[in-house]
């Protein structure tokens, strides 16, 4: 079982004499930067000059500068750029300015684990990864709460890397909820596996297959959409709130019996073998190499598949039905 750290296990004073640079003031960057600032720490933000992100950081009261300027000034450099942009920006705008004893931080381990970023030996390399989107990280912090985080140390030059990472996690509110210790390898591989097998890849493939089956059987596409896609949120919300048993206890007896007796026919031995194959592709670096080449080529496969997805009947039907439900577009 994972080791979990709380507020009492972290000391913000570890970071009091350090300048923290948030590289990339996007979804996570704005939340982490604003939370660290509100925790009394010295924070600077770096993004494209005069971009919306730059202006947002200024509005949040942070000093804003270019990536090279921030890298020169900071002691702790938290890289929160998209995975595919990190290696080039690191090589060109961060690495030349690293000094002995600096800390390189990440919220996802992809580029470190797959050697797209290879830091010098004289810096600490840590990860603090909130398990929630930036808006939630910020909102929970302002309410005096926090979002659980993962913490990992890849390189401990200072012999204080874990203390530093835990202090950072406390600064963004993570220790209020709990911080789970992991490794760069475990975070990266499980994150990719979850995205591909169920959260993004598996669930969308299942939705489309169920929808297509019903339409091919002669049912109206609108009715098929409700059953295959729209009602999924009702189920996932119940699981999210209270686990599998809250969901089973909340649906009808008919739904529970049907699901329990038929589910394994969908996720069968062949499906599980495919999951193992995908996991092995992740662990071996095969997927990483594929994604790196795809990014370098300008994302042709991704763009083609996105176009194909956008033309699926379920998208047309879904758009028409969602127009009948204006509350779906209302901000909470």
UniProtKB/Swiss-Prot annotation:
Binding locations of Mg(2+) 2: 191, 227, 231
Domain of life of the source: Archaea
Domain KARI C-terminal knotted: 183-328
Pfam family, one: KARI_N
Keyword Magnesium set for record: yes
Active site, per annotation: 108
Gene3D superfamilies from the UniProt entry: 6.10.240.10, NAD(P)-binding Rossmann-like Domain
Keyword Transmembrane helix attributed: no
GO BP field: isoleucine biosynthetic process; L-valine biosynthetic process
Enzyme Commission (EC) number: 1.1.1.86
Binding site for Mg(2+) 1: 191, 195
Cofactor(s) required for function per UniProt: Mg(2+)
CC cofactor note: Binds 2 magnesium ions per subunit.
Domain KARI N-terminal Rossmann residue range list: 1-182
Enzyme type, top EC level: oxidoreductase
MF (Gene Ontology): ketol-acid reductoisomerase activity; magnesium ion binding; NADP binding
Pathway: Amino-acid biosynthesis; L-isoleucine biosynthesis; L-isoleucine from 2-oxobutanoate: step 2/4; Amino-acid biosynthesis; L-valine biosynthesis; L-valine from pyruvate: step 2/4
Physiological role: Involved in the biosynthesis of branched-chain amino acids (BCAA). Catalyzes an alkyl-migration followed by a ketol-acid reduction of (S)-2-acetolactate (S2AL) to yield (R)-2,3-dihydroxy-isovalerate. In the isomerase reaction, S2AL is rearranged via a Mg-dependent methyl migration to produce 3-hydroxy-3-methyl-2-ketobutyrate (HMKB). In the reductase reaction, this 2-ketoacid undergoes a metal-dependent reduction by NADPH to yield (R)-2,3-dihydroxy-isovalerate.
Similarity field: Belongs to the ketol-acid reductoisomerase family.
Protein name per the record: Ketol-acid reductoisomerase (NADP(+))
């Amino acid at each position: 079982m994972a080791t979990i750290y709380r507020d009492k296990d972290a000391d913000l004073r570890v970071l009091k004499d350090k300048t923290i640079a948030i590289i990339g003031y996007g979804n996570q960057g704005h939340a982490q930067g604003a939370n660290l600032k509100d925790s009394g720490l010295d924070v600077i933000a770096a993004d494209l000059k005069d971009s919306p992100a730059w202006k947002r950081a200024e509005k949040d009261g942070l000093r804003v500068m270019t990536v090279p300027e921030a890298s020169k000034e900071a002691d702790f450099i938290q890289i929160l750029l998209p995975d595919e942009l990190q290696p080039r920006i690191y090589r060109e705008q961060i690495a030349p300015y690293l000094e002995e004893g600096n800390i390189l931080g990440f919220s996802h381990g992809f580029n470190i684990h797959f050697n797209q970023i290879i830091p010098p030996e004289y810096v600490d390399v840590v990860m603090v990864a909130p398990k929630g989107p930036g808006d939630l990280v910020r909102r929970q912090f302002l309410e005096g709460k926090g979002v659980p985080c993962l913490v990992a140390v890849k390189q401990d030059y200072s012999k204080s890397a874990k203390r530093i990472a835990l202090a950072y996690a406390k600064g963004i509110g993570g220790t209020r909820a709990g911080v789970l210790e992991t490794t760069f390898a475990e975070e990266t591989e499980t994150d990719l596996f979850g995205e591909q097998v169920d959260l993004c890849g598996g669930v969308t493939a299942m939705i489309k297959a169920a929808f297509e089956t019903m339409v091919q059987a002669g049912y109206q596409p609108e009715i098929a959409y409700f059953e295959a896609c729209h009602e999924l949120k009702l189920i996932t919300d119940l699981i999210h709130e209270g686990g599998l048993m809250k969901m089973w206890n909340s649906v009808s007896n008919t739904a529970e019996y049907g699901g329990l007796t038929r589910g394994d026919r969908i996720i069968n031995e062949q499906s599980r073998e495919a999951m193992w194959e995908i996991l092995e592709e992740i662990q071996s670096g095969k997927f990483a190499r594929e994604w790196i080449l795809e990014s370098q080529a300008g994302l042709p496969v991704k763009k083609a598949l996105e176009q194909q997805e956008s033309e699926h009947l379920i998208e047309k039907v879904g758009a028409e039905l969602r127009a009948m439900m204006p509350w779906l577009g209302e901000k909470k």
